[in-house]
Amino acid sequence: MMMVMQPEGLGAGEGPFSGGGGGEYMEQEEDWDRDLLLDPAWEKQQRKTFTAWCNSHLRKAGTQIENIEEDFRNGLKLMLLLEVISGERLPRPDKGKMRFHKIANVNKALDFIASKGVKLVSIGAEEIVDGNLKMTLGMIWTIILRFAIQDISVEETSAKEGLLLWCQRKTAPYRNVNVQNFHTSWKDGLALCALIHRHRPDLIDYAKLRKDDPIGNLNTAFEVAEKYLDIPKMLDAEDIVNTPKPDEKAIMTYVSCFYHAFAGAEQAETAANRICKVLAVNQENEKLMEEYEKLASELLEWIRRTVPWLENRVGEPSMSAMQRKLEDFRDYRRLHKPPRVQEKCQLEINFNTLQTKLRLSHRPAFMPSEGKLVSDIANAWRGLEQVEKGYEDWLLSEIRRLQRLQHLAEKFQQKASLHEAWTRGKEEMLNQHDYESASLQEVRALLRRHEAFESDLAAHQDRVEHIAALAQELNELDYHEAASVNSRCQAICDQWDNLGTLTQKRRDALERMEKLLETIDQLQLEFARRAAPFNNWLDGAIEDLQDVWLVHSVEETQSLLTAHEQFKATLPEADRERGAILGIQGEIQKICQTYGLRPKSGNPYITLSSQDINNKWDTVRKLVPSRDQTLQEELARQQVNERLRRQFAAQANAIGPWIQGKVEEVGRLAAGLAGSLEEQMAGLRQQEQNIINYKSNIDRLEGDHQLLQESLVFDNKHTVYSMEHIRVGWEQLLTSIARTINEVENQVLTRDAKGLSQEQLNEFRASFNHFDRKRNGMMEPDDFRACLISMGYDLGEVEFARIMTMVDPNAAGVVTFQAFIDFMTRETAETDTAEQVVASFKILAGDKNYITPEELRRELPAEQAEYCIRRMAPYKGSGAPSGALDYVAFSSALYGESDL
């Protein structure tokens, strides 16, 4: 049977194996009648090539053909071939073995071919069933055209021209290769080797090929293609070389296999690149997360170690030890804390940058591990600063306490030494029985002397009480040598009590003897009575002139100077009293000379001589100018301290308002930035540089503060700004400008990633600022909802809650400007999705629902292949080999849609 069926759209001169219009396969080169009379060499080539091509597909179904004109006669393998290459199911074949069953099966195959837009010309089922070789080869060629060549498209060309253009482009760089057709251009085998080398340079050493060895070149290409590219050998090298013009259809069929093999590889490469891109983003984000965790852990560990040190309030017994503690604290403030402040600021910047990158890549927001949130670090930092302030206050309080203790201890030692010097020998004197052998006058003298002693003793009562009071105060202030103080004080008190007892006993004895004795020297008594208090006054003056003091201001020093001047004003009257006392002694001597008395040496009523009074008076006169000089030196020191206070206050009163103004200015800049982001960044960088340049003023102020600390000046009434206030304000200013610069940098990232114009950013900023009612760079949920409604969003409670989870993933209760921009641009962004990554993995897996480690290592770079293998869960579906991996769950986890 001879059917002459022309495909739709064929005009005059078009052949049976070419299509017209949209289904054009190839141009007709010869008339159909000539095509029926194939050259025997061409027929041999076609028969071998078409058989190999059919078997390359039939083997997927577990079968093959041996004789092309015989094995397709019953139509069964023909239908199976079409199902394999099309991926579609054909009607159920007839199982009978009679001729009409075979014709029916072949017709089902031909109808399926026709349903694909191909009109068969002169090919009928009867010819195929009868084993007509020419018709069978023509039918197979039609199938090859439709299913292997028609879909080839390069630029504006398709089918044969597209395949030829593809070959020309791929082989263009190679020497001795000039592909112009599908027959003679392939005879020397170099074109096939060039195609293989272009895509798999590891398989062929093209430089070693020779144009004069066509059979060797062809066999090399055939063997490599069959072994490594899964392309069966469809041609014989000898047939191609020995034929003047090899069969075009055979060559096209074989070359099309290379196109499909390499096109699939290119598609896999594209899929691998997409996966690599996604994995690179994910790995970079994980690296940032790990860096954040490491930096946060180190900062928190430093705070954990530092806080106990600052909380330690165990005082030191000596001033030098406390001074060392103060120096350690200054070193901490100057050397150890500033780098940690920078780390804290950098930690916040890294966290914001990471969250921005995660939002831009549609990854879930980063949630640090427990206890390492930015808020946790801020809380820990606030706790550190609180104990730090308390530690500094405690240090200064302890130093003042030790100063007070040192002053009291020195005063106690001085007064105790004076008292002990006064009491030295008094007990031995009171225990004497000299009155037993004395005359009346001597007894009276002893009695009067004793009265003078009692007067002196009474005068010392206040000193003893003062010594006891000093000891009590030292105990109350926890003086570290309180035990020795108590022991000495107790010895003084015991001795004083004993002196009182002995004094009373001696008086009783003298009064008993007084009844027997009548002579008394009134003048000596008068001398004793006046000299004793004057001597007391001298002792008190000497003690006061040698007294130590502790002052903290010019006013206190002036008060001491005034008291000293008042004391000097009493000296003339004291000098007159001294003259009167010395006059009494002179009168005694005159009377003795007048009446020829020979008294015992010294005054019987007092051990004090006029020489003693003169010596003490000379001591007082020497101590007065010395105390004048000491007080003037102290006044000069306090005046220097006052200048230091005023110098510090002048700088602090300028720096404090400057810092406050800059903080407010940065706040205004953050709330109302104008101009392009680059201009804003330049302005902020200039502000940052101005702030950095101002650091020298802070350093000078620190120097003045250091001088005040070294001079032990701890108060300053000339300014409300302490060094701590300046430090806190300076750290707040640095943090504020760094945070604002980071926000603009994130806006640049968002703009570049989302493709926003400056006008759009300005519009977003204007809307955001309008509803930022608190002017703190953040909108509260009600303000954010009002902003969305004003922009035309119709929001219900559920929808608004969903939007809030997007813009506020950490549930902070506010919407930042960065989150606002991200929401407004989210719908227009072109980003990767989990579905795209799944599709890419499916290409690498050859349309399987799982992928093997070998396929990952073959298609991906080694590092990222191993990353996928470690992270992918085992595939749990049926029919998978051991070690198969679930790429679907892995892709979803990359975008937060499931757990890794």
UniProtKB/Swiss-Prot annotation:
List all Gly residues biased stretches.
10-24
Instruction: Please list the GO biological process terms of this entry.
Output: bone morphogenesis; focal adhesion assembly; muscle contraction; negative regulation of calcineurin-NFAT signaling cascade; negative regulation of cold-induced thermogenesis; negative regulation of glycolytic process; negative regulation of oxidative phosphorylation; negative regulation of relaxation of muscle
| Keywords, alphabetical | Acetylation, Actin-binding, Calcium, Metal-binding, Repeat
Name-wise, this protein is Alpha-actinin-3
Q: Which gene encodes it?
A: Actn3
So where does Ca(2+) 1 get bound? 772, 776, 778, 783
Per UniProt, residues of the Calponin-homology (CH) domain are 44-148, 157-263
Report the sequence similarity comment from the record: Belongs to the alpha-actinin family.
> What is the role of the protein in this entry?
F-actin cross-linking protein which is thought to anchor actin to a variety of intracellular structures. This is a bundling protein.
Q: Where are the Spectrin repeats?
A: 287-397, 407-512, 522-633, 643-746
Q: Where is this region: Actin-binding?
A: 1-260
SMART domains named in the record: CH, EFh, efhand_Ca_insen, SPEC
Query: What SUPFAM superfamilies does the database record attribute to this sequence?
Result: Calponin-homology domain, CH-domain (SSF47576), EF-hand (SSF47473), Spectrin repeat (SSF46966)
Instruction: Please provide, alphabetically and separated by semicolons, the GO molecular function terms listed in this UniProt record.
Output: actin filament binding; calcium ion binding; identical protein binding; protein-macromolecule adaptor activity; transmembrane transporter binding
Q: Which domain of life is it from?
A: Eukaryota
Phenotype on disruption: Knockout mice are morphologically indistinguishable from their wild-type littermates. Their ambulatory activity, and exploratory behavior is similar to that of wild-type animals. They show no sign of severe weakness and fatigue sensitivity. However, knockout animals show reductions in muscle strength (grip strength), increased endurance capacity, reduced fast fiber size, shifts in fast fiber metabolism toward oxidative (aerobic) metabolism. In addition, knockout animals have higher muscle glycogen content and a reduced activity of muscle glycogen phosphorylase PYGM/GPh, compared to wild-type.
Where, in this chain's numbering, is Ca(2+) 2 bound? 808, 810
Pfam families reported for this sequence = CH, EFhand_Ca_insen, Spectrin
